[in-house]
Regions:
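Bacterial N-terminal signal peptides
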Residues: 18-27
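Active-site SXXK
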Residues: 66, 79-104, 130, 189-192, ...
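Active-site-proximal helix/loop microenvironment
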Residues: 70-85, 163-210
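A penicillin-recognizing enzyme superfamily signal
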Residues: 152, 182-298
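Extracytoplasmic
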Residues: 53-56, 75-77, 81, 85-86, ...
Length: 306
């Protein structure tokens, strides 16, 4: 199938994937709402046939209802390590350690000596660029305070966003996903992000969430860790993570030491989709490219339906 005029090239689709794509494209929005089963089945077929690799797992939600549209994940309710996808919730817990919310600090990242993945460091970091560039040093500083004195705040955030409580013996590295002890079921994690970007809290917390949204928007731009997600109508919110691989039940085996994850929410200002993708044996930054292609398939169907 040829690319849409004016769009970047799309991957060729199999016959079954192409049929599902056309079914979605030709289905009016009213029909999708009246027959959600047909819409979800067509979307599932399109994504599975267009992205058949067993190394790619995903959860696609309707951002407004938090209902699952499509899913390919061996055990979607089993908790898994999610790496840096925990960072926004640690930031929320940090802000809730006082009332009014705490001010976020400026942290100087020197690189590996500060526990960061970027060997040369990020330099002076505040919340928004630290989230966009996933600076470990910055979030380790927040998490250290949360681990030592913010247990109640973290429990409130976990309960509000329906995340499992972290283990009792908390460390800063665990809270930001550097080590794999705090694990989250994939579907629950996608729903927590939907709640995060659509929540309507009090004015003080709305300001904090607004900064988190800005950081996730910048993550998808050049220089951000999710920049490979590409350009999309209305832009996107994104957060990457690279998590230690833990072999799962059955035939789930590690292909490398780590797995790449990315959460993509689109469009940024009026979210329609929440897409969580995990790709085995790579980084979150690389997985963002796969997620971007999946999102493009969804967007193409919407463009044709208009």
């Amino acid at each position: 199938m040829e690319a849409l005029a004016g769009s970047r090239a799309r991957p060729l689709r199999s016959r079954a994937a192409g049929f599902a794509f056309l079914l979605i494209a030709l289905m009016p929005v009213q029909a999708q709402e009246a027959s959600p089963g047909l819409y979800t089945q067509a979307t599932q077929t399109m994504l599975d046939r267009s992205f058949p690799s067993a190394q790619i797992e995903y959860v696609l939600l309707d951002a407004r209802t938090r209902q699952t549209i499509a899913l390919r994940w061996g055990h979607p309710d089993a908790p898994v390590p999610v790496g840096s996808l925990l960072k926004p919730f640690v930031a929320l817990a940090f802000s809730r350690m006082s009332n009014p919310p705490r001010n976020f600090p400026t942290v100087v990242c020197h690189g590996k000596s500060d526990g960061c993945w970027r060997s040369g460091g990020h330099g002076s970091m505040t919340l928004v660029p630290a989230l966009a560039e996933s600076c470990n040093a910055y979030f380790l500083a927040l998490a250290q305070d949360v681990a030592s004195g913010g247990a109640n705040a973290l429990e409130r955030v976990s309960a509000e966003y329906e995340l499992p409580k972290p283990p009792a013996q908390k460390t800063a590295a665990m809270l930001i996903g550097v080590t794999p002890e705090w694990r989250i079921p994939p579907v629950a994690l996608a729903r927590s992000y939907a709640s995060l970007v659509l929540s309507h809290n009090d004015a003080a917390e709305r300001e904090v969430i607004g900064r988190l949204r800005t950081g996730m928007r910048q993550a998808a731009l050049p220089g951000g860790t999710a920049s490979k997600v590409g350009s999309h109508p209305g832009s996107v919110l994104a957060k990457t993570g690279t998590a230690p691989c833990i072999a799962g039940p059955g035939d789930e085996r590690c292909v490398a030491n780590g797995d790449g994850l990315v959460m993509v929410i689109a469009p940024a200002e009026s979210p329609r989709w929440v897409l969580l993708v995990r790709q085995r044996g790579t980084t979150g930054a690389h997985t963002a490219e796969t997620a971007g292609k999946m999102l493009s398939s969804l967007e193409d169907a919407v463009v044709l339906r208009r």
